[in-house]
Amino acid sequence: MTAMRRGGALLMALWTIAVLSVMVLSFAYEAHQQSGINVYVRERNRVNRFTEAGQAIAEVILLNYSSVADWTEDQDTEKLLEDDRWICEKQSLKMYANCTVGPLVLDEEHPESGTVTVEIQTANAGSQGIININQLYSGGGDGKYMERWWMLFKAYNIPEELSTPTDGTINLWNILIASWDDWRDEDDTVTAIDGDETGAEAAWYEEYEEQEKIDEEDRRRPRNGPIPDVHELAYLRGWRDYPQVLCGGVINPWEKPEDQITVKKPGIEHLFTTVGTKKIDINNCHSLDALVTVPGVYENPEDNDALDEALGVAQAILDALKVKPDYAVDETRDWWPFKDWNDLTERVEEDVGSDAGQYFAYKPDDSTVFKVKITGESMGMTHEVNAECYVKNGKVRYIRWRED
């Protein structure tokens, strides 16, 4: 019995040791996990503080960029920097409609702690989010808004007429334009183009949603005003039926491969924004597809070669920005903005029609909406903020603020 008891005691001791070992390992694992969580939280808080600092820097630049002196060839930049840390960025924003700060080390004693980068440009610029769609309708004061749609559709290979298995041959362009008009305008009259009611008001959507048994939370009615988000286009008549218009891809997959039509990716949605004016920041526009929609860049949109000719003019505009003009400029740059319409027409080798003048902006003004991108980085972690804002009465007012 004594031996059996000793054996049982030994087994119990071994079992207890095993349990304790598991508990110790568990505690160690939890401590390690907690340590990892603490590091994550600490670094996340750090990059959050970096983006907050970036916001402060952006606002300092935005609030008085317009009051600084223009860059001159003989300016004493070092002396100016002694008086204003951000003078170069302010001059850049004033003269070139964009500026970049950083990557900037905020803690000089611990440079490895991370950086912040601030990028500012006008809203109607860049390679996407250029055309304010809220201005591109019958009530937007643009007598050539339909022509601009036609050129946009041509640029993305969106067919004017489309043979469908359910509705026969439809005029897709008219449906897209008219349904957007009805969604955007303030009346309840169905828009007709060439005598056909190709638009859609509330009654059309009600009938469609009942027929398709659309869930209540997904039902929509015309906004009868400006839209806040370009993704809203996906709810419109025609646009919802042919999402390839927005995102690219084969628009008629029911056809034989040789008869299929591919809308150029990524589709037209990425060109749109919902803020700003009808003017494009010509000095910072990097999209040929946006430029070909400008009257004066294109001539007659109904010509078969209208798109090719417009692309040639648009490319000539972008090329001219990279050629140093024959007046005093900052030669450290690799591109030089157009000062105004006269400067543009003198520097661009192709003929640009006079109509284009009313669609181009050259510098920010009181009506300008800005895009601000703030990126904080620390220990491999990144926090990005994308905002849209404007300056009014001495304050930066935010229209949209998105964080990753």
What do the predicted segments below correspond to?
Residues T2, G8-A18, V22-D404:
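Compositionally biased linear targeting/interaction segments
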